Design a protein with these regions (language model features):
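Active-site environment of divalent metal-dependent phosphoester hydrolases
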Residues: 59-61, 109-112, 154-157, 177, ...
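N-terminal membrane-anchoring alpha-helices
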Residues: 1-39
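Conserved nucleotide-state-sensing and coupling region of NTP-binding domains
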Residues: 221
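His/Asp/Glu-enriched short active-site or ligand-binding loop at hydrolase and phosphoryl-transfer sites
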Residues: 153, 158-194, 226-237
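Basic- and aromatic-lined ligand-binding clefts that recognize polyanionic substrates
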Residues: 134-154, 159-160
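A cross-domain feature marking catalytic cores of carbohydrate-active enzymes
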Residues: 54-56, 80-82, 104-106, 149-151, ...
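Active-site beta->alpha N-cap acidic-glycine motif
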Residues: 26-115, 119, 123-136, 142-144, ...
Length: 242
């Protein structure tokens, strides 16, 4: 009996940290937002508004993802990997035309924290140049500079660098780990169970399972009364309350 109890205790101790990583409680996200206020995790509001962000764009799935977003009267911030942008200018044009927006996700799909400062700065600058070209082609100004680090990890040096470059670092508060988990239904249920006013959803382009996930998530959020917004729209909506 004592052995069984010990094994159960060990199992609980092993499972709890993984569960907290998979579904961090609101209190933990609130702590992160206080601890690193220069990083955007969520916004504080009682309004039924929620931010949608799409990482690892553009890809062969971008046009369908954007179509689903548009069908649900939603907007999103697409975080772009610079090495994927050449040859997908039409996707970028369509994103901007639709009222969604472009953000910076560095040049390659790798952990930004592992890069030397000079290389990261160069990559952010190069992706920024490409984003500016996309906006200029549409005769529209860049309204904001958002950077999301590859793999989602950052340190104090990166925060200082990003701030010096005039960028707002963005993480989020609802992440279904869809970059690794291919079950669209599981990912959709994760998002819907974590959605709350002011949340920022992180999901990924370049994965075919994102499409059915969004087909389930976006109509359900609308049914619950949420407006689904880009980061700029989300921040502006909160500013009107002040």
């Amino acid at each position: 009996m004592a052995t069984l109890l010990a094994l159960l205790t060990l199992a609980v101790l092993l499972v709890i940290p993984f569960y907290i990583i998979y579904k961090p409680p609101a209190s933990l996200i609130d702590y992160f937002a206080r601890r690193w206020p220069d990083v955007l995790w969520q916004v504080s509001t009682d309004k039924k508004i929620i931010g949608l962000t799409i990482d690892d764009a553009p890809s062969q799935h971008t046009s369908e993802i954007l179509r689903i977003i548009n069908e649900n009267d939603a907007h999103a911030t697409f975080f772009l990997i610079g090495s994927q942008m050449n040859g997908r200018e039409e996707d970028l044009d369509d994103i901007i035309k639709s009222g969604s927006e472009l953000g910076n996700h560095a040049m390659h799909d790798e952990a930004s924290r592992s890069l030397p400062d000079g290389q990261l700065e160069s990559e952010i600058f190069e992706v920024n140049r490409k984003i500016k070209v996309a906006y200029e082609y549409q005769n529209k100004p860049m309204v904001a500079n958002y950077f999301r680090p590859g793999s989602g990890f950052f340190n104090d040096k990166m925060r200082r660098l990003v701030d010096k470059m005039g960028y707002r670092m963005v993480l989020g508060s609802v992440y279904p780990h869809d970059a690794q988990i291919s079950s669209w239904r599981m990912n959709a249920n994760h998002i819907l169970s974590m959605a709350r006013p002011g949340a920022i959803i992180i999901c990924h382009d370049r994965r075919s399972w994102t499409i059915p996930m969004l087909r389930m998530v976006l109509p359900e959020l609308k049914r619950r009364g949420y407006s689904i917004m880009s980061l700029t729209e989300l921040l502006k909506e909160v500013d009107t309350d002040k």
